[in-house]
């Protein structure tokens, strides 16, 4: 029992197959489990290697993002006087549109309604005059 327990502990620690052979010379089932653990360890290394490659790609993307930000800052630095003016112009346009368009549209609709009512009365009056 102690040798089997020692084998399990050694397999968990990842010792070499030579150490397994030295400890487990009496049992024949133990080397079979040792080879099984070593075959499982090999794919784990390849999976870990793939994850490492993905991390490198992420770093490259982050570097590209920072580079773009730096370019924007460099372009904005010479045009510092024009950038605030553009922002003010956009704000002025927004306020101007909000103040002018809804008020004009409401007045136009109200004028159309009153104009239509006046047309109806005018159309009804001439029709009544020839009959009388």
Curated annotation (Swiss-Prot):
Basic residues bias spans = 62-71, 110-119
Where can this protein be found?
A: Periplasm
* Biased segments, Low complexity type: 20-45, 76-90, 100-109
The answer to whether UniProt assigns keyword Signal to this entry is: yes
Which residues does the propeptide include? 22-90
For this chain, the Swiss-Prot or TrEMBL PTM comment says: Proteolytic processing gives rise to the active protein.
Q: Does the keyword DNA damage apply?
A: no
User: What does UniProt give as the signal peptide span?
Assistant: 1-21
Report the superkingdom from the record: Bacteria
Tell me the InterPro entries matching this sequence: Acid_shock
Q: Which segments carry the region annotation Disordered?
A: 20-132
Swiss-Prot/TrEMBL keywords: Periplasm, Signal
Q: Name one GO cellular component term.
A: periplasmic space
Its function, per the record, reads: Required for growth and/or survival at acidic conditions.
Q: Which HAMAP family match?
A: Asr (MF_00546)
Family statement drawn from the similarity comment of this UniProt entry? Belongs to the Asr family.
Q: Which NCBIfam families match?
A: acid_shock_Asr
Q: What is this protein called?
A: Acid shock protein
* Record organism: Enterobacter sp. (strain 638)
Taxonomic lineage per UniProt? Bacteria, Pseudomonadati, Pseudomonadota, Gammaproteobacteria, Enterobacterales
């Amino acid at each position: 029992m102690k040798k089997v327990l020692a084998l399990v502990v050694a397999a968990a620690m990842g010792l070499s197959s030579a150490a397994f052979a030295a400890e487990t010379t009496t049992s024949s089932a133990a080397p079979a489990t040792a080879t099984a653990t070593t075959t499982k360890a090999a794919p784990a290394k390849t999976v870990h290697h793939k994850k490492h490659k993905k991390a490198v790609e992420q770093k490259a993307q982050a570097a590209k993002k920072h580079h773009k930000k730096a370019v924007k800052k460099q372009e904005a630095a010479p045009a510092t006087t024009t950038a605030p003016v553009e922002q003010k112009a956009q704000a002025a346009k927004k306020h101007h549109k909000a103040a002018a368009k809804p008020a004009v549209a409401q007045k136009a609709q109200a004028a159309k309604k009153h104009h239509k009512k006046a047309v109806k009365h005018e159309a009804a009056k001439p029709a009544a005059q020839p009959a009388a």
